[in-house]
Amino acid sequence: MRISYTPESIEDLKRLRKFVEVKNTSAAQRIAISILKGVSQLKVFPYLGVEVQQAPNPEIVRDLIIGNYIARYLIRSNEINVLRVWHHKENRL
């Protein structure tokens, strides 16, 4: 299964990294790597995340919790689309 990132999720990752980087550059890099590794697990385990109950089709829209971060994604036939990424203390998207 292939993983793709929406433009919004790419901007989310950049924003999160930049926010942490101000205080701790190495932590920002570790967090970015951790999120990308977590998302890569979806290639093998696409249903790893929890269903997003408010989604029109919660079976295919899921949230993957990666430490303090959440990656929302959509499961398609041969592809995982990462929709958004945020810190759990941020307002939900």
Give the ranges of each region predicted by the language model.
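Absolute protein N-terminus
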Residues: 1-2, 93
